[in-house]
Structures are given as C-alpha cells and as structure tokens.
A protein has these predicted regions:
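Glycine-rich phosphate-binding loops that contact phosphosugars or nucleotide phosphates
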Residues: 1-126, 130
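Glycine-rich phosphate/diphosphate-binding loops and the adjacent beta-loop-alpha structural elements
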Residues: 131-135
Length: 135
C-alpha cells in the first residue's frame, strides 16, 4: 500500500478500525493477485515493537490467504501467530532497528528481483567509481 493513499487509510480506519487498514486492502486485492497465474504473494510487515496489532493481523490474514508472510521487527513479537516468519533485529534502540529494518527491506525487495531505484542507483554509482573507492 502506498503511503500516499491517505484517503484510503482515513476511510477504512473510520469505517472498520485502524487495525483493519491492511487486511481490508488485501481483501480488495486478492482477486487481482489470484487472476494471474504463477503469482506468488509475499507480505512483509515492519514493526518496531513486533506487536503492532494492524501489522500482526494483516500478516495473519495474508497467511490465511496462502500468501507468504514475514515480520521484520525491532523486538521479538509476543503475539505473532504460528506460520509467520519473523526476522527480529532485537536491539535496545528503536532508531537502530528502524534503520536496519529499512536496509533489510530494500535489500529483500532488490534480491527478489523487483526494481528498487535507490539500490540500483547506488550499484551503478559504485561500479563507476575507481576501484580503490568501491566499498
């Protein structure tokens, strides 16, 4: 879900509650995903605490649809249902967890073969740099 969809967020939160924002979108998009053959859906949730109700419930709903579900968290979740994978940063500072989570998310998107302009630009920049400056 794009964060520029504020009217969607507002209307769903008003009608169904904040905890259902993502699950309602998944319900709407499910037919789009299932119409295409050989499409595998992976839902990645990001939560500093690991216990954000709207994130955990969306991952649970995605898992119920047969989609892969992964939680990247700053702290170990105490409420994550079985069958949902968790990658826990487990650090004291939320700032550190947020930075690491963001880097992992972009790398995962890139490694799965999706376009990630920020990473692609950095790879091109480093490949043009003199060998001694490449990191």
């Amino acid at each position: 879900i794009s964060m520029d969809s504020m009217s969607y967020f507002s209307s769903v939160a008003n009608d169904y509650g904040y905890n259902n924002i993502f699950t309602r979108w998944f319900d709407k998009m499910e037919s789009t995903f299932t119409k295409k053959k050989n499409v595998k859906v992976c839902v990645i949730g990001l939560s500093g605490s690991g216990n954000s109700k709207n994130i955990v419930s969306s991952l649970d709903g995605a898992r119920d649809k047969g989609w892969d579900s992964i939680l990247i968290s700053g702290k170990k979740s105490i409420c994550l249902p079985e069958g949902i994978d968790e990658l826990c940063i487990d650090c004291e500072s939320f700032h550190t967890a947020e930075l690491v989570t963001l880097m992992l998310f972009y790398q995962l998107v890139h490694d799965l073969g999706h376009e990630c302009p920020t990473i692609d630009k950095e790879i091109r920049r480093k490949s043009k740099a003199p060998k001694a400056l490449r990191g």
